[in-house]
Amino acid sequence: MKSLTELFGCFKRQPRQQEASSPANPHVSDTLSMGVAASGMPPPKRPAPAESPTLPGETLVDAPGIPLKEALKEAANSKIVIFYNSSDEEKQLVEFETYLNSLKEPADAEKPLEIPEIKKLQVSRASQKVIQYLTLHTSWPLMYIKGNAVGGLKELKALKQDYLKEWLRDHTYDLIVIGGGSGGLAAAKEASRLGKKVACLDFVKPSPQGTSWGLGGTCVNVGCIPKKLMHQASLLGHSIHDAKKYGWKLPEGKVEHQWNHLRDSVQDHIASLNWGYRVQLREKTVTYINSYGEFTGPFEISATNKKKKVEKLTADRFLISTGLRPKYPEIPGVKEYTITSDDLFQLPYSPGKTLCVGASYVSLECAGFLHGFGFDVTVMVRSILLRGFDQDMAERIRKHMIAYGMKFEAGVPTRIEQIDEKTDEKAGKYRVFWPKKNEETGEMQEVSEEYNTILMAIGREAVTDDVGLTTIGVERAKSKKVLGRREQSTTIPWVYAIGDVLEGTPELTPVAIQAGRVLMRRIFDGANELTEYDQIPTTVFTPLEYGCCGLSEEDAMMKYGKDNIIIYHNVFNPLEYTISERMDKDHCYLKMICLRNEEEKVVGFHILTPNAGEVTQGFGIALKLAAKKADFDRLIGIHPTVAENFTTLTLEKKEGDEELQASGCUG
């Protein structure tokens, strides 16, 4: 990738500074899509600008005009700033000033509006490119109001005058965060650290089954944290069976899992995290309000608590970080008789025979650990598994889960009927109906099966309908997610969004956390850094974990052409599985996707193995640094580990090849 020097031609470096890099196309918007888990989202189909313009320790020689760093600081800390290049633009500057002065109100008005000082800052054309790249505004001269990029005169005039007048007044808070998930909390604490007055609103509407939870969002309460703990509990069950092969003498009798004990342990841990977040907010002097926030004006929020008491709050800026909630299909009986991942981890009874509906990572992960506890589990899918992920890897996961003892049904439920009602001590019993092709006649016929628990995991949707975004004109996509110019609303410049609720953004907890912190530094401290939304390592915590980073086979071929892609792969056998004779050993697999005409630059890697997340995280940095296959070849592996297989790949994947067989230690 090109460096910023190559891209903008404006920087002179002090000696021995690290070379930074920039996106291949700085004009491509990174705007927008388990709030969710640090696992399970495919790499984005259209990567955002990949590299931050931040150059640590950089000296910017930028004349004429003030240095870029100073200019951005002024924009962040002044009420009104206009950036321009030359005296040729002075006429436009006068037009800005004239328009703003037209908003003045008479001195005898109830709250007379005074127009603050308008700072006109001259910057070089090179700095102009950087500022426009940071804001994704093409207009010039470019105006900032209270640290928010507005755009040019056209964009300024497009704002309602009443909104603009109110924007220039003082408000109670510098920032109100709506949503107390991982991203919202990170942003609130970072803004407070930068000296801003911050409030954070968080309120969880109960699921149709009545489940709610505390501060921390999806990941902590009903996503990655409880999911990973239950995944680990499932793996421990297999380790107990393996222990005999390793010489451990176990008590006679059947080893059984106790659902209630695990559930209570998981919920105790979550409760400690909920309390910890409240303590952190207090220590950071962030005002925590356990109320549901809704816009009632451009700079006003109505905060309604569980007692229906309403409090009005005002702020200069707002951050939407409300995340996602599970979707429910319009099928008779679904909302009455099914649960989602919102309910599973607090389920008061043992799930029993379970149907997981959906091909998402949530469905497969939950199916995996429930089967590991000894439950009869079926996964019902409409079409392909793990849409958006590498489909070769998805098929390998399906084959492993079938070998593991799970069942797969192709279809979609048409209705669900209750047979026995559930209680707090016992699961109910339900009959699920769906159409299935008769193998003898070829005709579709209705079939049914009884289950104790039905888990719906068909996808998630943004929590934006009841936040009042339409009241103030925040533009949303068809997905209900906020459309943004980076994290800034495309239509209301004092409203921002991060995390799962931002269109086009990977739905991953670490992404939301980093986006929140980086955004706060940019708008409150003038930092010239951006969140990098590409080449994000991720893991699906199925029984045999799937880790990946970069492009799938399908996306690599679509982007670069089939003839320019070379794929190295192998099947391997973890040493730990040899003595225990695990069936998993024939399913462990990895591959590396490279570009033929770019010295075999690595554009994606995928691995199906125990502890795939730990392996993927480490190798992810190689893609960020544009590593080539030869770099992996030169790296000496740690023996015996599964990770060392990335350093010994020699087999090229070709169409028509027979399935690989694992052999020897670690491959």
Swiss-Prot record:
Cofactor names: FAD
Annotated catalytic residues: H639 (proton acceptor)
Chief location of this protein within or outside the cell: cytoplasm
Single GO term (MF): flavin adenine dinucleotide binding
Positions bearing the Cysteinyl-selenocysteine (Cys-Sec) cross-link: C665-U666
Compositionally biased residues, Polar residues: 17-32
EC class of the enzyme, as a word: oxidoreductase
Reactions catalysed, as given in the entry: [thioredoxin]-dithiol + NADP(+) = [thioredoxin]-disulfide + NADPH + H(+)
Stretch list, region Disordered: 1-57
GO biological process: cell redox homeostasis; ecdysis, collagen and cuticulin-based cuticle
GO cellular component: cytoplasm; cytosol; mitochondrion
Expression across tissues: Expressed in intestine, pharynx, seam cells, hypodermis, rectal epithelial cells, neurons in the nerve ring and amphid sheath cells.
Disulfide bonds: C219-C224
Family matches, as PANTHER family: GLUTATHIONE REDUCTASE (PTHR42737), THIOREDOXIN-DISULFIDE REDUCTASE (PTHR42737:SF8)
Family: Belongs to the class-I pyridine nucleotide-disulfide oxidoreductase family.
Known partners and oligomeric status: Homodimer.
Name of the protein in its database record: Thioredoxin reductase 1
Gene it is expressed from: trxr-1
